[in-house]
Amino acid sequence: MKVAVLGAAGGIGQALALLLKTQLPSGSELSLYDIAPVTPGVAVDLSHIPTAVKIKGFAGEDATPALEGADVVLISAGVARKPGMDRSDLFNVNAGIVKNLVQQIATTCPKACIGIITNPVNTTVAIAAEVLKKAGVYDKNKLFGVTTLDIIRSNTFVAELKGKQPDEIEVPVIGGHSGVTILPLLSQIPGVSFTEQEVADLTKRIQNAGTEVVEAKAGGGSATLSMGQAAARFGLSLVRALQGEKGVVECAYVEGDGQYARFFSQPLLLGKNGVEERKSIGKLSAFEQNALEGMLDTLKKDIQLGEAFVNK
């Protein structure tokens, strides 16, 4: 199994690469790519960790050598948020980066599963889909927006509030991956109940958690370490499913039946070909139903922005 990380010299990429080097199954290959000249050195640094995961690093304009034979490609390349920016302010720079990298994937490893981490995910996934479509290699079961950070944050915040162990909590999060489009389904956590005020406050905290980190880092970056952990969790789940493990479920932002929007984050059963089944979002509370209806215009606009970027 070969996993490629694009944007591997950045804050998220390095954290992600470290976790994959220590946790991928024995015999896996890990390929690191970034435009930054330091990237082969990051690979050498990680190569000293004693795990049976082969690692190589590649730098420069051409990602092709890193992508050859990849089964999974995780894209974290792009610029990070600064205070006062929201994820959509990143669009102008990151849209071009994602478009270019996905074009290289389309020619080099068109059958790979692709996980997009680069923000704004609501939009960059639509860009990736349109690029793959133009190249005639789009498979909607193999393109994912990685929203796992919203899930791990939800798990952490709920556990803190309710005095539970965080590994006992699994909160499904649906919708998209910014602001109001992030909708944690707090009504679906077994054995945990909330007051209306707790639901409103927790939902807002989960939606604004990225900004909490950006402000706390005081201009020194955005969420890199928790995002690295979230991306590793998603990537490792995908690898396990591709290798035939049954019953692997993760939420991610994918193209579905269009019931809510063309792309929508929901629980997915993963399998040997990527998405095996898009699972129902289940029964929503009145608060959740209202939040879902209220976000769809924003989500659809984010998606259209990405489609238009490729098709202009």
Swiss-Prot record:
InterPro entries given in the database record: L-lactate/malate_DH, Lactate/malate_DH_C, Lactate/malate_DH_N, Lactate_DH/Glyco_Ohase_4_C, Malate_DH_AS, Malate_DH_type1, Malate_DH_type1_bac, NAD(P)-bd_dom_sf
Gene Ontology biological process terms in this record: malate metabolic process; tricarboxylic acid cycle
Catalysed transformations (reactions): (S)-malate + NAD(+) = oxaloacetate + NADH + H(+)
Keyword Transmembrane helix: no
Pfam families for the chain: Ldh_1_C (PF02866), Ldh_1_N (PF00056)
Catalytic residues in the record: 177 (proton acceptor)
Binding residues annotated for NAD(+), in chain numbering: 7-13, 34, 94, 117-119, 227
PROSITE patterns found in the cross-reference section: MDH
GO molecular function: L-malate dehydrogenase (NAD+) activity
Key words of the record: NAD, Oxidoreductase, Tricarboxylic acid cycle
PANTHER family: MALATE AND LACTATE DEHYDROGENASE, MALATE DEHYDROGENASE, MITOCHONDRIAL
Function field: Catalyzes the reversible oxidation of malate to oxaloacetate.
Family: Belongs to the LDH/MDH superfamily. MDH type 1 family.
Protein's name in the database: Malate dehydrogenase
Organism: Escherichia fergusonii (strain ATCC 35469 / DSM 13698 / CCUG 18766 / IAM 14443 / JCM 21226 / LMG 7866 / NBRC 102419 / NCTC 12128 / CDC 0568-73)
